[in-house]
Design a protein with these regions (language model features):
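Glycine-rich, basic loop-to-helix element that forms the pyrophosphate-binding segment
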Residues: 66-84
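Short aromatic/hydrophobic "clamp" motif used to bind/position activated sugar donors
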Residues: 89
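Short, flexible, basic/aromatic active-site loop/helix in glycosyltransferases
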Residues: 139-163
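A short, conserved alpha-helix in the catalytic core of glycosyltransferases
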Residues: 158, 164-183, 187-215
């Protein structure tokens, strides 16, 4: 029986997937026979050449699935999870690169603790530069407090499972528990699924979430420019998820406005010292108008 099933969803991901798979092989501290690697392709232009190279790279036991539709990141992952045979799932983005011996400690934790739900690791931008995105506070709270606590806990590497969700770019989760709460919500095409997954798992199974800062992975996000369309998607996804939970839109929008106010205040302060990221500052100002417009309509 396999100990872990790795699910990677691809969409025209040739520039990323081969190095991703190489990093799995390089940092696997358990026998390859214990690993089930599942690639779900979401209707790329030409998946067959990629599949052929992946078979050569990993071996004939790799599971390659051509999705019948591009239903989004969550839907693609659900296809892979339903096909998986191991009790523990590792969700990975194709632009993730493993760094450290990666599997033995988390899998031992799942095998020894039946209440363990999810296991997250430390996200890096490069081998030496930590990311600020290993975990985040839920947006179902005061926005000023969320921004301040996120900054503090990120700096100190403190993870508080009741209020914080682990990055969705790379995490282990117990398959049976994830299935019990319905897996990824397929109404969301991409982005912003982590808070909802954390909420549903916590409501059903409690606080069995663990963060291990000694195990690291690189997420190739460094250098990406601020994008107001991305921020709008995150807001719309939160509005959708919070509506499911009975939280009024005005509360979610107020939280976002509070977060934006705090970040803009920091931006103005940085301008005084000549250290302002002008692109990010401009995006924050534009996003503020988006939030205010939605507030007027709510």
């Amino acid at each position: 029986m396999k100990r872990v099933s790795i699910i990677i969803v691809t969409y025209n991901s040739e520039k990323d997937i081969y190095d991703c798979v190489d990093s799995i092989r390089s940092h696997a501290d358990i026998p390859k026979e214990d690993i089930e690697l599942i690639i779900v392709d979401n209707c790329s232009r030409e998946p067959e050449p990629m599949f052929a190279r992946l078979r050569q790279q990993w071996g004939e036991d790799i599971v390659l699935i051509e999705n019948t539709q591009n239903g989004g990141y969550g839907q693609g992952n659900n296809v892979g999870i339903r096909r998986a045979t191991a009790p523990v799932i590792l969700i990975m983005n194709p632009d993730v690169r493993l760094m450290d011996p990666f599997f033995a400690r988390p899998l031992k934790a799942f095998e020894e603790d039946s209440g363990l739900i999810m296991y997250g690791m430390k996200q890096m931008y490069t081998e030496t530069l930590p990311s600020r995105n290993s975990f985040w506070f839920t947006t179902m709270m005061n926005g000023y407090l969320r921004t301040l606590l996120t900054g503090l806990c990120t700096r100190m590497d403190w993870y508080l499972p009741r209020w914080m969700y682990i990055s969705g770019s790379c995490f282990f989760v117990r398959k049976s528990m994830f299935e019990a709460v319905g897996l990824f919500d397929e109404e969301v095409f991409m982005y912003g699924e982590e808070d909802d997954i954390h909420y549903r798992l916590m409501q059903r199974f409690g606080l069995g979430f663990r963060y291990d800062k000694s195990i690291r992975y690189i997420h190739l996000m460094l250098g990406r420019q601020p994008d107001i369309r991305y921020e709008e998607k995150l807001l719309d996804v939160d509005l959708y998820h919070h509506k499911k939970k009975g939280r009024p839109a005005i509360k979610t929008l107020t939280t976002y406005l509070q977060i934006n106010t705090t970040l803009l205040a920091r931006g103005y302060l940085m301008k005084l010292f000549g250290k302002c990221d002008h692109d990010n500052f401009a995006m924050l100002k534009a996003f503020r108008q988006v939030i205010k417009s939605k507030l007027k309509k709510s």
